[in-house]
């Protein structure tokens, strides 16, 4: 190991809160074991999980041993939110989600080699623990006034209250840290910015139960320059890591549209580019922002990371093809559909009129027949990147991409997909 991992995280701005940083820096002079946990509260991880997850990868690359924990037990409870109780999901649903996110988690760290990662599920030691054992061995060490002082608990008590189930969540997570320390000598937990209270609970429980000194780090909460929560798509939903839930094209577009004020910070937090590379991109943003070099690099790195180089090449080709800089017929149907689905897709049923005028109106690119005719006469109407000059033009079978798709474009930038039934 050369640069200490703590120094690396510091210049990247990845340390939000921590226990004694000097002690942790000293501990990481030798290989340590650390963990981060992920509860299966949905069928997929989302973009917001990436910063803590990539912390494990950073530590592994620095010569440390990561443990990835899937919360098969804690996912049955749910970490308390600021507002309202979580919906209780069935055991079968949580088990299925735990399996799905375990597959996703395994893509981001290396499970072979000298510092091979481990994948564990806290259901292994939690599900068979009796209530009496839990209360005596774990609950005994948690003063009620400390638990009530937690910010989330205080906010809930001021509004609609909190159930004993969710109130106990921090004890379950604290016990995970103790178990991982006993089993694997794990001495560090990393987590998201909202996990500090839970992490400190685990640090305290290790000290009380085992007399062990362990450590904790949280990463910053990722927001954009306007304070909006990171990772929400243009439609308002989460950016999922599962390509069936968020297409690689939508994923790529989210990052390529990052604001100048955000892009360098995102590159520091989400990629493994060196300080020198990031400094060069920061100069590009400051001096030539119109080129959007940093945004293109961010989108490429993030899509490679989550979906692989082949998917990245496909979405970059799609982005070029939509604006006439590549051949639309070279796109596979899945990528084509994802790219045109950024806007509402018009469907033309059998027997419905399908002249270029009708298609422009149906697609929403124009709002009247007169506007459609003006667009055509001014040379601004395109189908599959071919200019259309006749008002009565209709598509033939050979025009349909993958037998059913047309890509309409008005001018240089406005496009829409049409599906011919």
Curated annotation (Swiss-Prot):
Gene3D superfamilies: HUPs, RNA-binding S4 domain, Tyrosyl-Transfer RNA Synthetase. Pfam families: SYY_C-terminal, tRNA-synt_1b. It catalyses: tRNA(Tyr) + L-tyrosine + ATP = L-tyrosyl-tRNA(Tyr) + AMP + diphosphate + H(+). Residues 354-420 form the S4 RNA-binding domain. One of its GO terms (cellular component) is cytosol. Its EC number is 6.1.1.1. Catalyzes the attachment of tyrosine to tRNA(Tyr) in a two-step reaction: tyrosine is first activated by ATP to form Tyr-AMP and then transferred to the acceptor end of tRNA(Tyr). Homodimer. NCBIfam families: tyrS (TIGR00234). Belongs to the class-I aminoacyl-tRNA synthetase family. TyrS type 1 subfamily. This is Tyrosine--tRNA ligase. The gene is tyrS.
């Amino acid at each position: 190991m050369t640069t200490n991992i703590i120094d690396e995280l510091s210049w990247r701005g990845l340390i939000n809160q921590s226990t004694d940083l000097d002690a942790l820096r000293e501990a990481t002079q030798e290989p340590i074991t650390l963990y981060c946990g992920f509860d299966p509260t949905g069928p997929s991880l989302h973009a917001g999980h990436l910063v803590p997850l990539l912390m494990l990868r950073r530590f592994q690359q620095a010569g440390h041993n990561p443990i990835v924990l899937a919360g098969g037990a804690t996912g049955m409870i749910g970490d308390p939110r600021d507002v309202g109780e979580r919906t209780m999901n069935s055991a079968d649903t949580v088990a299925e989600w735990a399996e799905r996110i375990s597959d996703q988690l395994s893509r981001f760290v290396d499970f072979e080699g000298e510092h091979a990662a481990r994948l564990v599920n806290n259901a292994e030691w939690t599900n068979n623990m009796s209530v009496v054992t839990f209360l005596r061995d774990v609950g005994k060490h948690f003063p009620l006034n400390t638990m009530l002082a937690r910010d989330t608990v205080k906010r809930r008590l001021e509004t609609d209250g909190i159930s004993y189930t969710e109130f106990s969540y921090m004890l379950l997570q604290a016990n995970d840290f103790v178990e991982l320390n006993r089993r694997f000598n794990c001495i560090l937990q990393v987590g998201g910015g909202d996990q500090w209270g839970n992490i400190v609970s685990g640090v305290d429980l290790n000290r009380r139960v085992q007399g062990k000194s362990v450590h904790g780090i949280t990463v910053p909460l990722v927001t954009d320059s306007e304070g909006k929560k990171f990772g929400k798509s243009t439609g308002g939903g989460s950016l999922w890591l599962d390509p069936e839930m968020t297409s690689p094209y939508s994923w790529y577009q989210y990052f390529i549209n990052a604001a100048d004020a955000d892009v360098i910070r995102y590159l520091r937090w989400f990629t493994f580019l060196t300080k020198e590379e990031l400094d060069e991109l920061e100069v590009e943003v400051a001096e030539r922002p119109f080129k959007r070099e940093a945004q293109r690099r961010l989108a490429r790195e993030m899509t490679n990371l989550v979906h692989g180089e082949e998917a990245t090449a496909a979405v970059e080709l799609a982005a070029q093809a939509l604006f006439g800089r590549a051949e639309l017929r070279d796109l596979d149907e899945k990528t084509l559909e994802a790219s045109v689905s950024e806007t509402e897709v018009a469907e033309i049923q059998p027997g419905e009129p399908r002249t270029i005028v009708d298609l422009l109106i149906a697609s929403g690119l124009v709002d009247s027949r007169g506007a459609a005719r003006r667009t055509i006469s001014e040379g601004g109407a395109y189908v599959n990147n071919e200019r259309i000059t006749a008002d009565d033009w209709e598509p033939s079978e050979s025009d349909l991409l993958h037998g059913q798709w047309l890509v309409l474009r008005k001018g240089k930038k406005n496009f829409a997909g049409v599906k011919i039934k």
